[in-house]
Amino acid sequence: AHLRYSFRFRPGSRPDCIYGGVYQGIGVSYYSFGNRGELGNPVAVYLFQGARIARISPLVSFNYEWNFGLSAGWKPYDNDYNSYNGAVGSRVNAYLNAGIYLNWSLSRYFDFIIGGDFTHFSNGNTKFPNAGVNTTGAKIGLVYNFNREEADLTKSLVHPYVPRFPRHISYDLVLFGSWRRKGVYVESGKQIASPGSYPVAGFNFAPMYNLNYKLRFGVSLDGVYDGSANVYTEDRIVEYDYDGGSGTSGRRFLVPGIQHQLALGLSGRAEYV
């Protein structure tokens, strides 16, 4: 179940025509997997954005939408009390959703939507286990429009004058940081979980050539420091009183020099709005 609020450009306006009726907003959703004792019934808070892919008729369009946010209320893995949960290891997980649907404008106030979507819950390897939870499903709902006028239902057929796009170069700079757990290979060829978390940080710097209102492309300089890169283990006896069932007892995890944990490279970028 979802409850959302969104906003968009005025129907028939120049930005609305250029960007295909794009809209964005914030939403809240509730999930039940039929196993509250092991997985919980999480609640997600998220941002969403969507737009028209194609117009089928004056009142019917084929749209896409994606969501991104956080979900809480999970029952994470516990070696003693919830050992059957091999999917999630944290109480808070990232929420990602993408889907396509038909939008039918019924009246000035109401739209009917029907389609399908894919959802992924994960903590991004910040805790183990992190198999995640994936779902696919059908969606059906009603959209209430607060400020839409009767005339707005036909404005989508009007194409206002769009001036020629001034091509130019822009620059994107992204800084990021996080942490992660690591599975390390041992002599038997199996992986065991390291006992701690490792920092991750990096940047992307990309000059982008803006070709038109919707498309830009360029080359990005990417740098990353991954504290878990090339971590290895030796079969040595160390003082672990209890390993929590992780299999780390009796092993020392070794971190190589920083020169083995840095990476720098180039990548191609393309963005279609």
Predicted segments with their positions:
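Outer-membrane beta-barrel translocator/channel fold
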Residues: 1, 12-18, 38-39, 56-96, ...
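Residues that define the transmembrane beta-barrel architecture of outer-membrane proteins
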Residues: 1, 20, 39-45, 90-96, ...
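Transmembrane beta-barrel strands of outer-membrane/channel proteins
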Residues: 1, 28-30, 64-72, 114-120, ...
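Residues on the lipid-exposed face of transmembrane beta-strands in outer-membrane beta-barrel proteins
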Residues: 3-7, 47-53, 66-70, 96-104, ...
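Repeated loop/turn-to-beta-strand initiation elements of outer-membrane beta-barrel proteins
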Residues: 12-15, 104-112, 148-152, 213-217, ...
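Extracellular loop and loop/strand-boundary signature of outer-membrane beta-barrel proteins
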Residues: 33-36, 82-88, 123-130, 188-193, ...
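Outer-membrane beta-barrel "beta-signal"
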Residues: 134-155
